[in-house]
């Protein structure tokens, strides 16, 4: 429990129209000035170093959730290190991440081949930091095979485009990393919306323009939203993701705009834990990723 407590992030979900407390003066700085001091995602990834038996990276404060890396970034870094250590991997099909402790300080990421078959490759990847083991993950890569099956039951939400939706990341004291993303609320509710269902559909994109077919970029973005259960919250509260499981539905997703629609739905929230599902949609209406997440909620 000590490690979980150390990785908590407090979501202070007060709208920007409310008076700003003196303790969060940084939000008085114009957004353009804030971004000029931030590390673009592409620069962050380029800073990963190869060592004898692992890859290492130190995170700038603007990419942190409290004092630790948030789950989506940790997942993305594990995938990047896995690709660098294993050439010619087929597309990522599935991954399971267990967030054991806070990802703080200099991070070392080691990937180990578990099994290589004719079409499927399994890799185990661990991330360690100053507090010890931070992430333990298993990644499954698979080449396409001929199949007589072509079916999917997911139905894309009928929502307006991002240009016609209001801004999403407009609350004070949100985690530092949220400033790296542009968000537009397409459906559902903002956190701390009294009486609303705990679900939201939000258009998301990186402020840093890059290769939008990159699964590493998509993983970092797919976990950018707060848990859908925080729609039910009445006060700010710390949260900590415990596990994150993803299934990739499009081997090579394409995107010409940079926008992805994240549809997050809380299934249950009780006894201090929330279970939710998130579906990531491409702008042309294709489901590209489905994720399940278990979150500890301290409030």
Predicted features by range, described:
Residues 13-16, 34:
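Short hydrophobic targeting helices and cationic amphipathic motifs
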Residues 33-299:
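Terminal targeting signals and extreme-terminal segments of soluble enzymes
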């Amino acid at each position: 429990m000590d490690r979980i407590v150390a990785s908590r992030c407090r979501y202070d979900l007060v709208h920007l129209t409310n008076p700003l407390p003196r303790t969060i003066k940084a939000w008085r700085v114009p957004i353009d000035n804030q971004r000029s001091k931030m590390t673009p995602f592409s620069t962050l990834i380029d800073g990963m170093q190869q060592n004898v038996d692992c890859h290492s990276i130190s995170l700038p404060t603007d990419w942190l959730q409290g004092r630790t890396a948030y789950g989506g970034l940790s997942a993305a870094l594990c995938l990047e290190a896995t690709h660098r250590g294993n050439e010619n991997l087929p597309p990522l099909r599935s991954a399971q991440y267990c967030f054991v402790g806070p990802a703080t300080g200099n991070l070392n990421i080691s990937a180990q081949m578990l099994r290589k078959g004719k079409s499927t490759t399994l890799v185990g990847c661990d991330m360690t930091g100053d507090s010890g083991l931070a992430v333990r993950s298993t990644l499954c890569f698979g080449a396409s095979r001929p199949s007589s099956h072509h079916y999917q039951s997911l139905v894309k939400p009928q929502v307006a485009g991002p240009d016609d939706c209001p801004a999403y990341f407009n609350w004070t004291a949100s985690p530092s990393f949220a400033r790296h993303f542009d968000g537009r609320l397409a459906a559902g509710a903002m956190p701390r919306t009294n009486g609303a269902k705990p679900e939201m559909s939000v258009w998301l994109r990186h402020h840093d323009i890059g290769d939008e077919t990159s699964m590493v970029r998509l993983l970092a973005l797919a976990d950018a939203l707060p848990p859908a259960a925080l729609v039910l919250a009445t006060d700010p509260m710390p949260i900590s993701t415990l596990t994150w499981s993803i299934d990739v539905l499009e081997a090579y997703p394409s995107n010409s705009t940079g926008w992805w629609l994240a549809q997050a739905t809380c299934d249950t929230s009780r006894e201090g834990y929330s279970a939710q599902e998130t579906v990531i949609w491409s702008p042309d209406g294709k489901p590209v990723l489905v994720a399940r997440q278990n979150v500890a909620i301290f409030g």
